[in-house]
């Protein structure tokens, strides 16, 4: 598959009479977009605001972040299985409004969602303080059940992303990047002397609103399978998660997964990047055994020399991570794991809930238990009150202070300890 990704650089977003891109500015017809999103009977009200990097704004709680994209040429459309037919995507041309994002907020399910600060110390921990954001405030009807609530918020974000993406359909991109992965036998024939590597992409599927979707299918119900890396760039994988914000992969991160982008950088030079194995993180032991067995079997079947394995979430999925690592290593395949840590606020506790000697090459996204004080900001979008902040994942009794500042673990900040490296955290040895 060969995909041309055309980046249209967005330097500002403003409301206007029509939705269009002009001279690097995305103009949004607010009422038209609200009308587009208001058809869901589960949503009581829709409003939206525009926020920009450096503004004294706090968004909380955050459900998802979506990048506006549009399929210009090629099979299918963006978000197959949800907003487009279930066609195989990942080839042709896709235009991206780079620098723009849709952020969904409102009364969010379970209040395990995150915080995005557009300025101050918290802004350094979230990549979405650097994007111009259309924030969708979606309030549910009274008495809505949790799963219906999550689905409604998810669809609002996806629809907004698709609507805004259409503004880039007929725009000449500022930059075009080409990504290509050939069928396995062609690829091996082209690079016979290069080591074969793949990416084992673990998806959050613990259930109870910890869900990820692949072509519209709940990933709990899949067995590990192989996909082209470019399929991910067209929205084949998307987030349905209400889970700790620091290390869940928002839909935006799936579409821009840096592991995939970085593996392409040296493809055909230092190694042969043959594809992506997607697998899940179900909670029952039998499911974990099945999925890790299939993942290792597939890695062996492809004749791989090495894999990178990324986790999503923590705790229960640590077992899936170590199972995958151990079983793939046992096949004689080199492994590197990507994770983050819950090592206590002093960093002295065990970082993962599971471990094995096979996991001897590890990249960490940081310690999610580290605490930070977020100063009071001038404007709040969403819900920031004691009954929200004190129970957010990473919060505690007394997190919201009387002066409006918030003391939380960085676990509460969207994308702070990204396990695919979509952040600025690193580790150093002294």
From Swiss-Prot:
The peptide chain is cleaved into beta and alpha chains, and the alpha chain N-terminal cysteine is deaminated and oxidized to form a reactive pyruvoyl group. The keyword Oxidoreductase applies. One of its GO terms (molecular function) is glycine reductase activity. Disulfide bonds: none annotated. It comes from the Bacteria. Signal peptide: none annotated. Keywords: Oxidoreductase, Pyruvate. It catalyses: acetyl phosphate + [thioredoxin]-disulfide + NH4(+) + H2O = [thioredoxin]-dithiol + glycine + phosphate + H(+). The modification Pyruvic acid (Cys) is found at residue 242. The active site is at 242 (schiff-base intermediate with substrate). Its EC number is 1.21.4.2. In the first step of glycine reductase, the substrate is bound to component PB via a Schiff base intermediate. Then the PB-activated substrate is nucleophilically attacked by the selenol anion of component PA to transform it to a carboxymethylated selenoether and the respective amine. By action of component PC, acetyl phosphate is formed, leaving component PA in its oxidized state. Finally component PA becomes reduced by the thioredoxin system to start a new catalytic cycle of reductive deamination. Heterohexamer of two alpha, two beta and two gamma subunits. Component of the glycine reductase complex, together with components A and C. PB is substrate specific. The protein sequence in PubMed:11422384 comes from protein overexpressed and processed in E.coli. This is Glycine reductase complex component B subunits alpha and beta. It comes from Acetoanaerobium sticklandii (strain ATCC 12662 / DSM 519 / JCM 1433 / CCUG 9281 / NCIMB 10654 / HF). The gene is grdE.
